[in-house]
Regions:
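Helix-coil boundary/capping segments in enzymes
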Residues: 1-149
């Protein structure tokens, strides 16, 4: 029997790369602190306690093997949907994250599958991004936050 982790959130490498360069990422700002630090944005103060939020795909695979997990369904970590952004920035965030998830899946298709994030600021933009994510990137669906606005 295969073990599938359907609750496998990903904190985008593009976010960590921006923070390493002392830049904000789509309105999110990094503050050093215990664990992996704090990320503020969208009206929220998020404490990232686990070192796993910075895992590379290779580290994620090692962790999966150690836990006996065969497949992970990757989706954006919930604080980072970016619903607080304007339509254009929300669309850019979604596209960046979806491309990162798709690249991870392409590199390890037997171990990962992916769910898109959508720019819910605008319904037609969200529909277009879902279509792109599924038909062009090969993602399996989308994850939405419980609160869009």
């Amino acid at each position: 029997m295969r073990t599938i982790d359907i609750h496998a959130h990903l904190v985008p490498r593009s976010m960590w790369n921006a923070f390493d360069a002392k830049k904000d990422w789509y309105g999110f700002h990094f503050e050093p602190g215990p664990g992996a630090g704090y990320v503020n944005g969208g009206g929220a103060h998020n404490h990232l306690t686990s070192p796993k939020v910075k895992f590379t795909p290779e580290e994620r695979l090692k962790d999966m093997d150690a836990q006996g997990v065969d497949i992970q369904v990757l989706s954006i970590h919930t604080p980072f949907f970016g619903y607080h952004l304007d339509k254009k920035e929300g669309q850019a965030l979604a596209r960046d994250v979806n491309q990162e998830i798709a690249a991870t899946v392409r590199d390890n298709p037997k171990r990962f599958c992916g769910m898109a994030t959508l720019p819910m600021q605008d319904v037609s933009t969200a529909i277009a991004e879902l279509e792109h994510a599924v038909t062009k990137l090969g993602l399996k669906g989308a994850e939405l936050d419980t609160q869009v606005n």
